[in-house]
Design a protein with these regions (language model features):
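Short, linear, compositionally biased motifs with a strong N-terminal bias
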Residues: 11-12
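Acidic, serine/threonine-rich low-complexity disordered tracts
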Residues: 21-122, 164-263
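N-terminal signal peptide c-region/cleavage motif recognized by signal peptidases
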Residues: 15-17
Length: 263
């Protein structure tokens, strides 16, 4: 009996310890920030503008508690639609200290339309994820997963990454995290690539950036999915994203930034 009590107490302490590690101190953004991007695609060594993207953060309520709602919308142009249709909307709700609460993704990519949803629940037993995924008219796939580490979706992880302190990283450092999607929750990595000065040729603005890569596991190998450049200042604004796609490569460059937290 005594041994069982110790095990139960240890499990509760582990769970509460995990929950205590989830919040992060956010000093990079606040509600009201709006970022717009131009999208470019590489075709036979030539870069073409193929669409736009917008990222917006607002302070709101989620089930009665203060929260951030952040969304990322990508839209291909009519010209690009002749070759590949792209209409993605990703939305996440987090607490004000960037603990994920809810995530959805609706994506029209080519002829495939998919819907994803992740609902996060936190309690003494750990963190439970209610996952939902559907592609085209296929049956809805549902799954419930319990994890002991803090999970993140694509958008909430990007928000958390904006609070990273670049002075504490060395080139090659790896940040492990759980990536939650509609189909599954898997261990992934963000790799710190170092500092780099980047000039946006379309706006003629030069940025001092911290560079990170999101790396995805494929069996025993790793695949670099997105490399993102964030300003090396208090705002840590993503000013450039390099996307490594199955059908080529694409880039997103910051066009305008409004409502930034630190002037």
């Amino acid at each position: 009996m005594k041994h069982k009590i110790i095990l139960i107490i240890s499990a509760l302490c582990l769970a509460m310890g995990t929950l205590a590690q989830c919040p992060v101190r956010n000093t990079a953004f606040s509600g009201g920030e709006h970022l717009s991007y131009d999208l470019y695609f590489n075709w036979k060594f030539i870069w073409f503008k193929v669409g736009s993207a917008e990222m917006d953060i607002q302070q709101t309520k989620y089930k009665g508690q203060d929260a951030y709602r952040a969304y990322l919308i990508t839209r291909g142009s009519k010209t690009a639609d002749r070759y590949f249709v792209l209409r993605d909307t990703l939305t996440t709700y987090t607490t004000l200290d960037i603990v994920p609460l809810f995530y959805t993704k609706n994506a029209l990519e080519g002829k495939r339309y998919s819907k994803e949803r992740v609902v996060y629940s936190y309690n003494e037993e750990g963190i439970t994820l209610d996952l939902t995924y559907q592609k085209n008219s296929d049956p809805v796939r549902k799954n419930i997963v319990t994890v002991s580490e803090c999970p993140y979706d694509m958008i909430s992880m990007l928000l958390k990454a904006r609070s990273f302190d670049g002075s504490k990283f060395k080139v090659g450092d790896r940040i492990k995290f759980l990536m939650a999607e509609g189909k599954h929750c898997e261990e992934q990595y963000i790799v710190y690539r170092g500092r780099e000065k980047f000039t946006n040729d379309y706006t003629d603005v030069t940025y001092d950036c911290l560079v990170f890569s999101f790396v995805e596991k494929e069996g025993k190998k790793e695949k670099e999915v997105v490399t993102f450049y964030v300003t090396n200042d208090k705002n840590h604004i993503p000013v450039r994203l390099d996307l490594h796609l199955k059908f080529g490569s694409a880039k997103a460059f910051l066009h305008t930034a409004k409502g930034v937290r630190n002037k």
